[in-house]
Amino acid sequence: MIRAVVDSPQNEHTLAWLFLDLLVIEHRCAPGMDTVVLEMTLPVGSSPALHVHDSLDDTWYILDGEMVVRCGDDTLVVGAGYWVSMPRGVPHTFRVVGDQDARILLVHDNASFRDFIRALGVPAAAYVVPAQPVFPAMDELARVARAHDLTPIGPPMSADDADAILAATVH
């Protein structure tokens, strides 16, 4: 018999991780599916290094908050209700802006990013953003990232860059 997969915060199958300055909740999909869904809570100011995935389209739906996104030569301001899909091979980064944490659903067609989170994350005892970020040594972070199809190629987006993009954008 095929059964539906249902996760909830109280479900013993739901995995949650503290990763860098993020809370990551891993949602299960039906058996045999390659789809990976991660719910991430990102604090204001959170910004990953400019990076590229060679075999993963980085796709997310924004549930809460506002972000400035750089994908290739494009910059945009996005918020709740936006769907963002950045193609593999294109450098990208973002920064959470405003006065509210961002909450996004990542939807990926392979497990490389989820496995990156699992490799460096710390199991979360509660569904809250870590009070103290969990940052591994930068050389370890870069090594594990590259092993999971994430190649850092530049710095995170600075607050000044995000502010300049916000100032130039009518929203």
Where are the regions that the model predicts?
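Short acidic-glycine-tyrosine-enriched beta hairpin
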Residues: 8, 13, 31, 66, ...
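Conserved hydrophobic/aromatic beta-strand scaffold that supports enzyme active sites
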Residues: 24, 37-39, 59, 75, ...
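Residue-level recognition of conserved beta-strand positions in structured domain cores
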Residues: 39, 52, 71-73, 80, ...
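Active-site region of the double-stranded beta-helix
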Residues: 24-35, 44-57
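A short beta-strand-loop-beta hairpin characteristic of the jelly-roll/cupin
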Residues: 47, 53-82
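A hydrophobic, small-residue-rich beta->alpha segment in the mid-to-C-terminal subdomain
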Residues: 115-130
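Ligand-binding loop in jelly-roll beta-barrel domains
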Residues: 68, 88-114
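A short, N-terminal "cap"/entry segment at the start of jelly-roll beta-barrel domains
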Residues: 1-35, 128-171
